[in-house]
Structures are given as structure tokens and as C-alpha cells.
């Protein structure tokens, strides 16, 4: 099976070490462009652009990198409750047209109550998933060209529609990750690709089986992906030494403060990540070659595959055998590590190389709109 391999744009910061300003690297637009162009040339299929108050806006970053890349796809965040589903559908179609069909969308419900309150979203975990289901139902139908009336518990729209369609038909794919039962129900009903963070294979297999069963009950099939860091070197010894260096400047106080901050999250996935290491820097290899050191201070994806090229490839194939076809990787610093992954890991995998887009994007295919929603007539129709 050919694998889709994505990289990551560190819009929240980058560096050689975790939890310290030593070795930190300024992340400006030029640096993000370097990483995006490297990923494009090295054969990565796309890049995940993170979202949240610690990150630059993923949509603006993606739009700014369209002109300087050729094949690379951009996986950007949809934020239910933060924006209307109709407006989000218009934005999605525009990004897809401007990128010539290189837009992908990642549904993010949020997990930090403090951040969500700051964004004006005052819903609990269950309510957010209710709102996300309503959002996604509307977003999908609008992008697929339907006129939508919807009267939900959290969202109501009347006459929602899209005048300029996306390049990808019937619409760009929707990605989503979540570990709670409500999240799995949403994935089974609404998304094309279900993402998990890098838990041990046995735990990932259990989640895949649960989502598959729920999707089958609705007559659907869902693809699967996984989000992991990678520390790959020419030898296993060098790789493990690099892992140790990555957290070599972390002190107990920094770890304690990071874990206290992450503990307020109501995300089940974040809780599962934290349980892998328990805030303890001892015994961080939680499964063969799966290292939880990143999660000591980082929210979200907190594990890395560590080893030489053949060893990491063997672990990737273990996940692939579970049904995963998409791997979203990252590494510190992200520019150099993109080359290491491509040079040391890709030769041991069947990597699906992205194709050059064949059709041109457009803004308006039929001239200027009349009034607000009337298509202009040709002379022969007059």
C-alpha cells in the first residue's frame, strides 16, 4: 500500500531543544516558506498547519504559501463555533480554487476551555461535539452545491449556498481527530479520514476498530491517519542520542508547569497522551521505538518514532497494517528534519508522490455577479 506522508509547519515556534530558548529559531514567513518548499521538493504530499492561540492563523499561512509551492497540499483547521459553517464553506472553496485543488480541511473542536472562552465559545465538551456535528453537516452540503436550510440546537441557517464551487469535487476531503465516543460518532458520520495521535499500536488498533464499526453502521467507510514526530538517524544509537538531546534542557519545574497547564484540557486525546508518560521523564519508550518525551511539554501530538531508517520504517509499516494510509510527521528543527526523513526514511517505504495539478484555478467562471446572487446572462440569452 502506498502511503501518504505529510510534514508540519511549526507556526507556534521551532528550535533544537524543547522547553528552552536556547537553540530556538525565529519563525517568520521566510522560514515557513523554506520548510514548505523543502517539503514540496522532497515529495511530502502535504503539510499540517496547526491552529490555536499559540499559532499563526493557518488559513493565512496556507494562502501565503500557495504561490511558492507546486504540488504541496495544505491541511488547515475548521473551527466549529468560532465561525459560521456557511462562511467557512466559502473560505474553503476559495482556498481550494486559489491553490488549484490543494486544500484539505481538519475539523478541530478544541480542547482548552480557557482558550475557547477567550474565543467566545462557552460550550462544554458534549455541547461542542453537538455543535461540530451540526456545523459539519451544513459545511459539507453547502460545499457540495446544495441550498441548505438547517434548524439545529446550536446552529440555524436558511438559504445557505455557495456560488463559486471548489476545484475538488464534490468537495475537498475532511480530516478529523478525537478520542472520545462523541468524536468517534462524528467521524463515522461526517469525515473522510480519521486521525489519531501516536499511541502504541494496540491502542491505535482499538480506536480504528471502533470507528470502522460505527462507520459501517452508517453505510460508510473511513480512511485512517496518524500524527507522529520522527527522530531518524543513520544508526539507532544516534537516533536515541538525538532524542535525549531534544529534552536535555528540560528541568522538572518546566515539566510540572506544562503538565499542570495541559491538565485543564477536557480533550480525551490529550488525557491519553499525558497518561503515556505521567509527567515522568523515566521510561519514556512506551512501545518499541515509540518515545513519549515530546509530550512532557508539548500539547497534542506527544510521541516520536525513534531509530534508523529501517527501524522507523518497520514501525510505520506496523501502523499501516492496521489500516493507516496517511502519516503526518514532524521533527525538531523542522527544516533539517524534513530532509532527514526524506533521505533516511522514504527509501524504505512505498511513498505516494503528489502529482502536479492539471487544471487551473479560477475565481469567477462566468463574469461579475449581478446584484448579490444572479448569474450574468450571455448575449444569446438576452
Curated annotation (Swiss-Prot):
The keyword Cell division does not apply. SUPFAM superfamilies: Bacterial luciferase-like. One of its GO terms (molecular function) is alkanesulfonate monooxygenase activity. InterPro entries: Alkanesulphonate_mOase_FMN-dep (IPR019911), Luciferase-like_dom (IPR011251), Luciferase-like_sf (IPR036661), SsuD_RutA_monooxygenase (IPR050172). Its EC number is 1.14.14.5. It is an enzyme of class 1 (oxidoreductase). It catalyses: an alkanesulfonate + FMNH2 + O2 = an aldehyde + FMN + sulfite + H2O + 2 H(+). One of its GO terms (biological process) is alkanesulfonate catabolic process. Keywords: Flavoprotein, FMN, Monooxygenase, Oxidoreductase. CDD domains: Alkanesulfonate_monoxygenase (cd01094). Belongs to the SsuD family. HAMAP family: Alkanesulf_monooxygen (MF_01229). Catalyzes the desulfonation of aliphatic sulfonates. PANTHER family: ALKANESULFONATE MONOOXYGENASE, ALKANESULFONATE MONOOXYGENASE-RELATED. This is Alkanesulfonate monooxygenase. It comes from Pseudomonas putida (strain GB-1).
